[in-house]
């Protein structure tokens, strides 16, 4: 019986292996949080070309060159402070980003780790999409 089960499992694995079937990609929480909170303005690729970008006086920042514009170092704290609403952004663009600072902090006083983790995950994703 065990041989039959093993052979059946092996046959199924072969069929799926050669049919293009694959396991779903692991969920990337940072990418998911970026897409739901940032991509409308900054674009899926982070280059400032999202569907809402045309509504602003100034084009949203190209997030793929943050490290390049900072001598090769990704400015973690500065980006964090912008996302959570503490650091002002370009004067030509009203503070539309404050909406996300408030949204991330709206989880309540007992859940301080949730917004920090979400912002950190977004920043981790941004670090991975930096232009080389």
For each of these PLM feature ranges, what is it?
Residues 1-4:
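N-terminal secretory signal peptides that target proteins for export/translocation
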Residues 8-19:
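Bacterial N-terminal signal peptides
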Residues 14, 41-42, 108:
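Amphipathic alpha-helical interaction segments
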Residues 16, 29, 111-114:
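Alpha-helix capping and helix-coil boundary motifs
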Residues 25-26, 31-58, 72-73, 84-95, ...:
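Periplasmic/extracellular electron-transfer cofactor-ligation site
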Residues 56-117, 122, 126:
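Extracytoplasmic electron-transfer domains, predominantly the class I c-type cytochrome c fold
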């Amino acid at each position: 019986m065990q041989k039959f089960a093993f052979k059946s499992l092996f046959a199924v694995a072969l069929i799926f292996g050669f049919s293009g079937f694959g396991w779903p990609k692991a969920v990337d929480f940072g990418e998911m949080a970026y897409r739901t909170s940032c991509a409308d303005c900054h674009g899926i690729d982070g280059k400032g070309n999202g569907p809402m970008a045309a509504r602003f006086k100034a084009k949203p920042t190209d997030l793929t060159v943050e490290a390049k514009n900072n001598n090769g170092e990704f400015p973690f704290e500065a980006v964090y402070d912008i996302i959570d609403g503490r650091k002002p952004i370009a004067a030509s663009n009203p503070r539309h980003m404050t909406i996300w600072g408030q949204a991330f902090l709206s989880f309540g006083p007992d859940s301080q780790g949730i917004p920090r983790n979400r912002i950190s995950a977004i920043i981790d994703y941004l670090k991975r999409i930096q232009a080389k």
